[in-house]
């Protein structure tokens, strides 16, 4: 068997790396995603949606995390760095645990007033921190001499995009995230509205929630059984549909450049 010289292998790897970097640099936008198991890279919808939107996907979602973890990762600099922030066009949040993320009863006027690190006791407070901190970080680039936004009036324009759960079973979260979006004037990726089925109608053959058709596991919400985690992979129908819904929302904010 003929051996391939090590130099040839290294050269090929170098060319592939440079090609990937070049393709990323040619994208019109960069979108940063934070989330948990519904958003992690093994799903595929975010990457599909970014491709349709001519955007570079920066997927920092990790299964098992919550919005509290996202807040803590901003604090320790692992969700994004200041250098990355310079190039991020939108922060997309898909932390969709079925909690009230709008409750204003314990919110602080200033994000610096929250005790850190965050625990998982108050989802609304963690959302409030992430939003205010991201907006502040974008604004403060106006004081960074290395930033292209240095000495500008507004700093870096901050775009935050919220997401519903992938179907309409999680009423508490879906309702409250829309209230949160309305409060801030943020766009919402309405997966639950455009996924193609509703909790209000059962499947005519199975007699179950239609979401059960697309998952290998299940969850109980208010005594009713729904599908839980949609099947992973870009080839899966739900991932493709979610990618299309996401791209449709993002194109309304960021038009595809010629």
Question: What does each model-found stretch correspond to?
Answer:
Residues 69-74, 119-130, 142, 169-173, ...:
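Soluble or luminal CAZymes and related metallo-dependent hydrolases
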Residues 101-103, 133-143, 194-204:
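Short regulatory "switch" loops immediately downstream of catalytic or recognition motifs
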